[in-house]
A protein has these predicted regions:
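Membrane-proximal basic amphipathic "stem/tether" segments
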Residues: 1-59
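Intrinsic-disorder-associated interaction segments
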Residues: 2, 11-18, 22, 69-81, ...
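Exposed alpha-helical structural elements
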Residues: 5-8, 79, 83, 166, ...
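Short coil/turn segments at secondary-structure boundaries
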Residues: 25, 98, 186-189
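Eukaryotic compositionally biased low-complexity/IDR segments
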Residues: 54-69, 74, 78-80, 93, ...
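Low-complexity, Ser/Thr/Pro/Gly-enriched N-terminal "stalk/linker" regions
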Residues: 79-125
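Aromatic-lined, polymer-binding surfaces characteristic
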Residues: 120, 127-130, 134-227
Length: 227
C-alpha cells in the first residue's frame, strides 16, 4: 500500500470511526477487485414490472394523488414565470445560487465549471470522484438531481399550465445518455436517491397527462429499478 493510501485510511479511521472505516475498506476492496462491477451490471434485460394502467390503479399513497390534489392559489407569479422560462431554455440554478446556461442539448456528463467531460462508457466504479482535472464532480451531479423540475411543476400548479412534455423529455434524455451503471451519475447513492424521488414526484404530479404514455412510463420505471 502506498503511503498516500495509508494516510487516507488512517484519516478516515480517526475522523469517522471504526464502523465506517471497515465499511469503506470493504467498499474499496470490492471496487478495485471488480466485485462491485459484477454486482452492478450494465445493459440489463428489459423487464416490465407493472403497466401504467395498473400503477394508476394500485399506486401507493404519495404526498398527493396527482396535481389536482394541490389546492394552490391560481394566480400569476412573475418571478416564478421568469425562473421557469430560464429552465426550459437550458439554464439551471446551481446550488440554489448561480445560474449556468447548459443549453438544450446538454450531455449530463460535462462539468460546466471546468469543461471536463466524463467517459460515460466507463462503469461507475472506474470513475474517480476526486480528480483535479475534472474538478468538483458535484457540478455534474447538480442537474442530474432533477430538483430543477420543482419550479416547473409549481408554475403548472399555480397557473394551470402543462409542462409535462418538457419534464418527461428531460427524464428520457437523461436515461438515453446515461447507460445503466455507467458514468459519473451512478457514482453516489445519495444523488441517485434524490433523482429517483424527484422522478417519482413528477410521475405522480403528471400521472394523468397525455404525455405519460405506456412507453414513457416503462422507460422511467426500468431506469428507476436499475438505479
Amino acid at each position: 500500500m502506498k503511503s498516500r493510501d495509508f494516510l487516507k485510511f488512517y484519516n478516515i479511521l480517526q475522523n469517522m470511526g471504526s464502523r465506517y472505516f471497515f465499511f469503506r475498506a470493504k467498499y474499496e476492496l470490492e471496487r478495485k477487485t471488480g466485485i462491485l462491477k459484477k454486482k452492478f451490471i450494465v445493459n440489463p434485460t428489459i423487464r416490465q414490472f407493472i403497466s401504467l394502467v395498473e400503477w394508476k390503479r394500485t399506486a401507493f399513497p404519495f404526498f398527493f394523488h396527482d396535481r389536482n390534489d394541490l389546492h394552490l392559489s391560481k394566480q400569476s407569479n412573475l418571478v416564478l414565470e421568469q425562473e421557469v422560462k430560464q429552465i426550459i431554455t437550458g439554464s439551471i440554478p446551481y446550488f440554489s445560487a448561480t445560474w449556468i446556461q447548459l443549453g438544450l442539448d446538454y450531455d449530463w456528463i460535462t462539468n460546466p465549471d471546468t469543461g471536463y467531460q466524463y467517459d460515460v462508457s466507463k462503469h461507475w466504479t472506474e470513475v474517480e470522484d476526486i480528480d483535479l482535472k475534472a474538478g468538483d464532480i458535484k457540478y455534474v451531479w447538480e442537474k442530474s438531481r432533477f430538483s430543477f423540475l420543482y419550479p416547473v411543476m409549481r408554475l403548472d400548479a399555480h397557473e394551470q399550465q402543462d409542462h409535462s412534455d418538457f419534464v418527461f423529455g428531460q427524464i428520457l434524455d437523461w436515461i438515453a445518455k446515461n447507460p445503466v451503471n455507467c458514468g459519473p451519475n451512478y457514482k453516489c447513492s445519495q444523488e441517485i436517491s434524490l433523482r429517483v424521488l424527484n422522478w417519482i414526484f413528477a410521475l405522480y404530479f403528471y400521472r394523468n397527462s397525455n404525455r405519460l404514455t405506456e412507453a414513457v412510463f416503462q422507460k422511467i420505471i426500468h431506469s428507476i429499478f436499475w438505479q
